[in-house]
From Swiss-Prot:
Cystine pairings recorded for this chain: none
Quaternary structure (record): Binds to the N-terminal domain of the chaperone ClpA.
Name of the molecule in the record: ATP-dependent Clp protease adapter protein ClpS
Range of residues in the leader sequence: none
TM region positions: none
Family per record: Belongs to the ClpS family.
BP term (GO), one: proteolysis
Purpose: Involved in the modulation of the specificity of the ClpAP-mediated ATP-dependent protein degradation.
InterPro entries in UniProt: ClpS, ClpS_core, Ribosomal_bL12_C/ClpS-like
Amino acid sequence: MAHTAFETSLDTLLEEPKMYRVLLLNDDWTAMDFVARILMEVFDKTSDEATAITLKIHNDGKGVCGIYTYDIAELKMQIVSQMAKQHGYPLRVITEEMP
């Protein structure tokens, strides 16, 4: 039985969205308490989770804040960049596509 255009279109619409990691990068100027605050306010991390991720960023140079669809990852990246700029920090945030 041949697929109709509707069935083919429906199959295309049901694909899983690509997921993206949002990462914060370490620098020598951004205060660790500010990074923890970002993690709690923007990424909904608990205080313990925020502390653990902040230490990972400090020790390893970067840390994963969360995994989201593209639009959400980009929005969170913009929010973090804006908050860092408002507070005078050079905090960098990037996204990476999940394999």
